[in-house]
C-alpha cells in the first residue's frame, strides 16, 4: 500500500510517499524561512501564497524522483490541523481534489499525532502505553499514548512554546528568524558559569511548562549592557539553553513518575537539539528505560510523518471517523480511537 502525504500546517510545504512494506520511500520539504525571516516571524497570508505556489511542483517532483506512478497511490493523507487556517486549506484542498480525481480515499491527519509517532518511522513501534513529549515551535506537550488514536494530554505549555522561546531569545541576541537552531550553535562557545537563568515552574509541583518568563529575563539581561560583544551573546545563549534543558529534564522525571512509564518518545523541532538529546539519554539510562527520538531530518514539519500515520489509518480501514476538512484547533484528545 502506497500513501501520499501532504503537509501544510504552517510555513513548510511537504510531500512524501510511504510504503507499508518498504517504509518511507521519499520525502521533501520546501521551507519558507528566507521569506519570513525579514518579518521576524511567520506571516500567515504569505505562507498560504507560497503553499499554493509550491505544492503541485513539489508533489510532481517526488513522483519523478521516486520513479513511482501517481496511479500506484492507494490513498492520500493530509494535515487537517492544528495549524494556520489558510495554510491548512491549501494542503487539504489539493489532497482532496487529487484523491477525487484519482478515485482513491483521502484522510485527514492530526499534525501533532504525526509528530508524536514520527520516531516509529525509524524504530520498531514501541508497546503501548508510552509517554510522549512534543517540543516544537507551537506546542510543548506531554502526551500519554494508550493506543493509536487514544491520547491524553497530561502536561501543556501555559504560554510560549519551547521552540517559540528559542526564536524570541535568539531575536533579542540579534539572530534572524528562525534563530533557535543558530542560538544553539553559538551556545557551544558560551561560558556556562557566567550567567544563570531561572528554571521556570520547577519549584512547584506539576508537569506544565511556562517559558515566557525566560524571554523577559533574557530581555532584561540584554538591556543591562550598553553594547554586547560576541562572547557575551554566546554566554547568554548558553545560560538560556542550560535552563531549558534542566527544566525539560526535571519535568520529564515527574511525568515518568506520574505515568510509571519506562518508554519515552521525543519529537518536534526542538528535539533535534543535541545537548538536550544527550541529557535525555542519560536520564532514561539511569531509569533503565527506553528512549526514542525522531530522525533529525524528520524533527521539523514534514509530510513523512503524515504519510506514515495515514498508512496506519488506511490499514485499519478507519477513515470515516476522521473525515474532516480542516480544524485549526484540533486537539490530540479529539482523535477517534482505532481498534486493534
Swiss-Prot record:
Keywords: Acyltransferase, Cytoplasm, Iron, Metal-binding, Transferase, tRNA processing. Transmembrane segments: none annotated. Its cofactor is Fe(2+). GO terms for molecular function: iron ion binding; N(6)-L-threonylcarbamoyladenine synthase activity. Fe cation binds at residues 111, 115, 301. NCBIfam families: gcp_kae1, T6A_TsaD_YgjD. This is tRNA N6-adenosine threonylcarbamoyltransferase. It comes from Wigglesworthia glossinidia brevipalpis. The lineage of its organism: Bacteria, Pseudomonadati, Pseudomonadota, Gammaproteobacteria, Enterobacterales.
Amino acid at each position: 500500500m502506497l500513501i501520499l502525504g501532504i503537509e501544510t500546517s504552517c510555513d513548510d510545504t511537504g510531500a512524501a510517499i510511504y510504503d507499508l512494506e518498504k517504509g518511507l520511500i521519499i520525502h521533501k520539504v520546501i521551507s519558507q524561512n528566507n521569506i519570513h525571516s525579514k518579518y521576524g516571524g511567520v506571516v500567515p497570508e504569505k505562507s498560504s501564497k507560497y503553499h499554493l505556489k509550491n505544492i503541485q511542483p513539489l508533489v510532481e517532483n517526488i513522483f519523478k524522483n521516486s520513479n513511482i506512478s501517481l496511479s500506484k497511490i492507494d490513498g492520500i493523507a493530509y494535515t487537517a490541523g492544528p495549524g494556520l487556517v489558510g495554510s491548512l486549506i491549501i494542503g487539504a484542498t489539493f489532497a482532496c481534489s487529487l484523491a477525487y480525481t484519482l478515485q482513491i480515499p483521502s484522510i485527514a491527519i492530526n499534525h501533532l499525532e504525526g509528530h508524536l509517532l514520527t520516531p516509529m518511522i525509524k524504530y520498531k513501534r514501541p508497546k503501548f502505553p508510552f509517554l510522549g513529549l512534543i517540543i516544537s515551535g507551537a506546542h510543548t506537550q506531554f502526551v500519554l499514548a494508550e493506543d493509536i488514536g487514544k491520547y491524553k494530554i497530561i502536561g501543556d505549555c501555559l504560554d510560549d512554546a519551547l521552540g517559540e522561546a528559542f526564536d524570541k531569545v535568539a531575536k533579542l541576541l540579534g539572530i534572524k528568524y528562525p534563530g533557535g537552531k543558530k542560538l544553539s550553535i553559538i551556545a557551544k562557545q558560551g561560558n556556562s558559569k557566567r550567567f544563570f537563568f531561572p528554571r521556570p515552574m520547577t519549584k512547584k509541583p506539576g508537569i506544565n511548562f511556562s517559558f515566557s518568563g525566560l524571554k523577559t529575563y533574557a530581555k532584561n539581561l540584554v538591556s543591562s549592557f550598553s553594547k554586547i560583544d560576541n562572547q557575551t551573546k554566546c554566554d547568554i545563549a548558553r545560560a538560556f539553553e542550560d535552563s531549558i534543558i534542566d527544566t525539560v529534564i526535571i519535568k520529564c522525571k515527574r511525568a515518568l513518575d506520574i505515568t510509571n512509564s519506562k518508554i519515552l518518545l521525543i519529537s518536534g523541532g526542538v528535539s533535534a537539539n543535541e545537548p538536550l538529546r544527550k541529557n535525555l539519554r542519560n536520564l532514561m539510562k539511569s531509569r533503565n528505560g527506553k528512549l526514542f527520538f525522531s530522525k533529525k531530518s524528520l524533527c521539523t514539519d514534514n509530510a513523512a510523518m503524515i504519510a506514515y500515520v495515514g498508512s496506519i489509518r488506511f490499514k485499519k480501514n478507519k477513515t470515516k471517523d476522521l473525515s474532516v476538512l480542516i480544524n485549526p484547533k484540533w486537539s490530540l484528545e479529539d482523535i477517534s480511537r482505532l481498534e486493534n
